[in-house]
């Protein structure tokens, strides 16, 4: 067996105008595909550790040292992107009632949440991700990670993710990351967020 590049759950142009087809094609077929290939190359060196990336990245000390960083970078890149694709929707969706209530409880209002999430995504220096996670206490928390690091390695369960690497937005938004973040909020798959939230509680 090997890690497989998942197909997008929609057409490459389905998220336009927010996310353009050229960016989606490059992002999925080139960037994500490279993470998958590099992950498989690392795992082939140590078949004894298996292929459950979530378990491996939950405790990176269990990953053999010679492939540890490769799996953090590439295995994390695969998991992050596989989740990211599922969190985007061609059809506009309203926030589900359970997630809306949890957001109100954690942040005071949806607007406050959106402001804090945007700040986390904008403030991430260089490449990385912004996240809404369920933490170890079962509470919602906004965080960001560098590179392809995943909150799973911190014992947190991601329920919303935004890729802020420049390859995710530069063709369409150039260096104006806030406009990309604003567009992201227009195409979130809130049903998937709810599904992840219910599973993480």
From Swiss-Prot:
**SUPFAM superfamilies, per this entry?**
Fe,Mn superoxide dismutase (SOD), C-terminal domain, Fe,Mn superoxide dismutase (SOD), N-terminal domain
Q: What class of enzyme is it?
A: oxidoreductase
Provide this UniProt record's keywords sorted from A to Z: Manganese, Metal-binding, Oxidoreductase, Secreted
**Which catalytic reaction applies to this protein?**
2 superoxide + 2 H(+) = H2O2 + O2
UniProt-annotated binding residues for Mn(2+): 27, 81, 163, 167
Cofactor(s) listed in the protein's UniProt record: Mn(2+)
Q: Where in the cell is it found?
A: Secreted
Example GO CC term: the record gives: cytoplasm
Q: Which residues form the signal peptide?
A: none
An example molecular function term from Gene Ontology annotations: metal ion binding
Enzyme Commission (EC) number: 1.15.1.1
Explain how, and how many, cofactor molecules are bound: Binds 1 Mn(2+) ion per subunit.
Q: What is its main location?
A: secreted
Which InterPro entries does the annotation name? Mn/Fe_SOD, Mn/Fe_SOD_BS, Mn/Fe_SOD_C, Mn/Fe_SOD_N, Mn/Fe_SOD_N_sf, SOD_C_sf
Q: Which family does it belong to?
A: Belongs to the iron/manganese superoxide dismutase family.
Its quaternary organisation is:
Homodimer.
What is known about what this protein does? Destroys superoxide anion radicals which are normally produced within the cells and which are toxic to biological systems.
Designated name of the protein: Superoxide dismutase [Mn]
Its source organism is: Streptococcus pyogenes serotype M3 (strain ATCC BAA-595 / MGAS315)
């Amino acid at each position: 067996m090997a890690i497989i590049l998942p197909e997008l759950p929609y057409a490459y142009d389905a998220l336009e105008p927010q996310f353009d087809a050229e960016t989606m094609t490059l992002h999925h077929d080139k960037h994500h595909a490279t993470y998958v290939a590099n992950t498989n190359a690392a795992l082939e060196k140590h078949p004894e550790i298996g292929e459950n990336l979530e378990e491996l990245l939950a405790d990176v000390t269990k990953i053999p040292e010679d492939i540890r960083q490769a799996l953090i970078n590439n295995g994390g890149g695969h998991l992050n992107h596989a989740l990211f694709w599922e969190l985007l929707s061609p059809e506009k969706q309203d926030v589900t009632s359970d997630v809306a209530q949890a957001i109100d409880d954690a942040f005071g209002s949806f607007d406050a949440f959106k402001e804090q999430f945007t700040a986390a995504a904008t403030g991430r220096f260089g490449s990385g991700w912004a996240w809404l996670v369920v933490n170890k206490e079962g509470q919602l928390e906004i965080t960001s990670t560098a590179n392809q690091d995943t909150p799973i390695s911190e014992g947190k369960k991601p329920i919303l993710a935004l890729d802020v690497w420049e390859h995710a937005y530069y063709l369409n938004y150039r260096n104006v990351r806030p406009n990309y973040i604003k567009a992201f909020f227009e195409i979130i798959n809130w049903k998937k967020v709810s599904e992840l939230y219910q599973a993480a509680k």
